[in-house]
Amino acid sequence: YGGTCINIGCIPTKTLLVAAEKDLSFEEVIATKNTITGRLNGKNYATVAGTGVDIFDAEAHFLSNKVIEIQAGDEKKELTAETIVINTGAVSNVLPIPGLATSKNIFDSTGIQSLDKLPEKLGILGGGNIGL
Protein backbone atom coordinates (compact mmCIF):
# COMPACT_ATOMS: atom_id res chain seq x y z
CA TYR A 1 0.00 0.00 0.00
CA GLY A 2 1.37 3.36 -0.94
CA GLY A 3 1.83 3.35 -4.68
CA THR A 4 4.90 3.66 -6.83
CA CYS A 5 6.89 5.97 -4.56
CA ILE A 6 6.82 3.65 -1.55
CA ASN A 7 6.89 0.30 -3.31
CA ILE A 8 9.16 0.57 -6.35
CA GLY A 9 10.03 4.24 -6.86
CA CYS A 10 11.73 6.94 -4.84
CA ILE A 11 11.72 5.32 -1.37
CA PRO A 12 13.25 1.92 -2.24
CA THR A 13 15.69 3.29 -4.81
CA LYS A 14 16.98 6.00 -2.45
CA THR A 15 17.19 3.38 0.31
CA LEU A 16 19.31 1.23 -1.99
CA LEU A 17 21.62 4.17 -2.72
CA VAL A 18 22.09 5.08 0.96
CA ALA A 19 22.50 1.46 2.07
CA ALA A 20 25.07 0.82 -0.67
CA GLU A 21 27.17 3.73 0.64
CA LYS A 22 27.35 1.98 4.02
CA ASP A 23 29.35 -0.88 2.48
CA LEU A 24 26.68 -3.48 3.21
CA SER A 25 26.40 -6.73 1.28
CA PHE A 26 23.83 -6.84 -1.51
CA GLU A 27 21.67 -9.13 0.62
CA GLU A 28 21.77 -6.62 3.53
CA VAL A 29 20.91 -3.74 1.18
CA ILE A 30 17.88 -5.61 -0.19
CA ALA A 31 16.79 -6.60 3.33
CA THR A 32 17.00 -2.95 4.44
CA LYS A 33 14.92 -1.86 1.44
CA ASN A 34 12.32 -4.56 2.11
CA THR A 35 12.09 -3.63 5.80
CA ILE A 36 11.53 0.06 5.06
CA THR A 37 8.96 -0.51 2.31
CA GLY A 38 7.20 -3.13 4.44
CA ARG A 39 6.87 -0.73 7.37
CA LEU A 40 5.51 2.03 5.14
CA ASN A 41 3.05 -0.40 3.49
CA GLY A 42 1.80 -1.47 6.91
CA LYS A 43 1.44 2.11 8.11
CA ASN A 44 -0.50 3.13 4.99
CA TYR A 45 -2.77 0.09 5.21
CA ALA A 46 -3.48 0.78 8.89
CA THR A 47 -4.25 4.44 8.14
CA VAL A 48 -6.77 3.54 5.44
CA ALA A 49 -8.27 0.61 7.36
CA GLY A 50 -8.67 2.85 10.42
CA THR A 51 -11.07 5.12 8.54
CA GLY A 52 -13.69 2.40 8.27
CA VAL A 53 -13.44 1.87 4.51
CA ASP A 54 -13.58 -1.61 3.05
CA ILE A 55 -10.34 -2.72 1.41
CA PHE A 56 -10.26 -5.49 -1.19
CA ASP A 57 -7.15 -6.98 -2.78
CA ALA A 58 -8.67 -8.50 -5.87
CA GLU A 59 -9.13 -8.30 -9.60
CA ALA A 60 -12.30 -6.54 -10.66
CA HIS A 61 -14.46 -5.69 -13.62
CA PHE A 62 -17.53 -3.51 -14.01
CA LEU A 63 -20.94 -5.11 -14.35
CA SER A 64 -22.55 -1.66 -14.62
CA ASN A 65 -21.55 1.92 -13.79
CA LYS A 66 -22.19 1.32 -10.04
CA VAL A 67 -21.57 -2.41 -9.72
CA ILE A 68 -18.30 -4.32 -9.89
CA GLU A 69 -17.45 -7.96 -9.47
CA ILE A 70 -14.25 -8.68 -7.60
CA GLN A 71 -12.34 -11.94 -7.53
CA ALA A 72 -9.59 -13.01 -5.15
CA GLY A 73 -8.58 -16.60 -5.79
CA ASP A 74 -11.76 -18.67 -6.11
CA GLU A 75 -13.88 -16.14 -4.19
CA LYS A 76 -16.13 -13.76 -6.16
CA LYS A 77 -18.23 -10.93 -4.81
CA GLU A 78 -20.43 -8.19 -6.29
CA LEU A 79 -20.10 -4.70 -4.83
CA THR A 80 -22.36 -1.70 -5.40
CA ALA A 81 -21.36 1.89 -4.67
CA GLU A 82 -22.22 5.44 -5.65
CA THR A 83 -18.51 6.14 -6.19
CA ILE A 84 -15.92 3.56 -7.19
CA VAL A 85 -12.23 4.44 -6.98
CA ILE A 86 -10.11 2.70 -9.59
CA ASN A 87 -6.58 2.23 -8.24
CA THR A 88 -4.93 0.08 -10.87
CA GLY A 89 -1.32 1.17 -10.76
CA ALA A 90 0.73 0.93 -13.92
CA VAL A 91 3.25 -1.27 -15.66
CA SER A 92 6.38 -0.45 -17.61
CA ASN A 93 6.10 -0.18 -21.36
CA VAL A 94 8.28 -2.83 -23.00
CA LEU A 95 9.63 -1.56 -26.30
CA PRO A 96 8.99 -3.80 -29.32
CA ILE A 97 12.62 -4.91 -29.65
CA PRO A 98 13.02 -8.58 -30.64
CA GLY A 99 14.02 -10.67 -27.61
CA LEU A 100 13.58 -7.87 -25.09
CA ALA A 101 10.41 -9.14 -23.42
CA THR A 102 11.68 -12.72 -23.10
CA SER A 103 15.24 -12.01 -21.98
CA LYS A 104 16.21 -13.17 -18.49
CA ASN A 105 19.02 -10.58 -18.37
CA ILE A 106 17.09 -7.36 -18.95
CA PHE A 107 15.22 -5.73 -16.07
CA ASP A 108 13.04 -2.72 -15.55
CA SER A 109 13.40 -0.68 -12.36
CA THR A 110 10.89 -2.91 -10.56
CA GLY A 111 12.35 -6.26 -11.60
CA ILE A 112 15.90 -5.40 -10.63
CA GLN A 113 14.77 -4.59 -7.08
CA SER A 114 13.63 -8.21 -6.71
CA LEU A 115 16.98 -9.83 -7.52
CA ASP A 116 18.48 -12.11 -4.87
CA LYS A 117 22.01 -11.72 -6.15
CA LEU A 118 23.94 -8.70 -7.40
CA PRO A 119 24.74 -9.04 -11.12
CA GLU A 120 28.45 -9.32 -11.90
CA LYS A 121 28.05 -6.60 -14.56
CA LEU A 122 25.24 -4.14 -15.07
CA GLY A 123 24.46 -1.51 -17.68
CA ILE A 124 21.80 1.08 -16.88
CA LEU A 125 19.69 3.08 -19.33
CA GLY A 126 17.98 5.99 -17.60
CA GLY A 127 18.78 8.50 -14.94
CA GLY A 128 17.78 9.94 -11.62
CA ASN A 129 17.47 7.94 -8.42
CA ILE A 130 15.36 5.24 -10.02
CA GLY A 131 17.81 4.78 -12.90
CA LEU A 132 20.76 4.69 -10.53
Q: What function would you assign to each model-found segment?
A:
Residues 1-40:
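Beta1-alpha1 glycine-rich phosphate/pyrophosphate-binding loop at the start
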Residues 3-8, 18, 40-125, 129:
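FAD-binding core/adjacent interface of flavoenzyme oxidoreductases
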Residues 132:
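Residues forming the Rossmann-fold NAD(P)(H) cofactor-binding site
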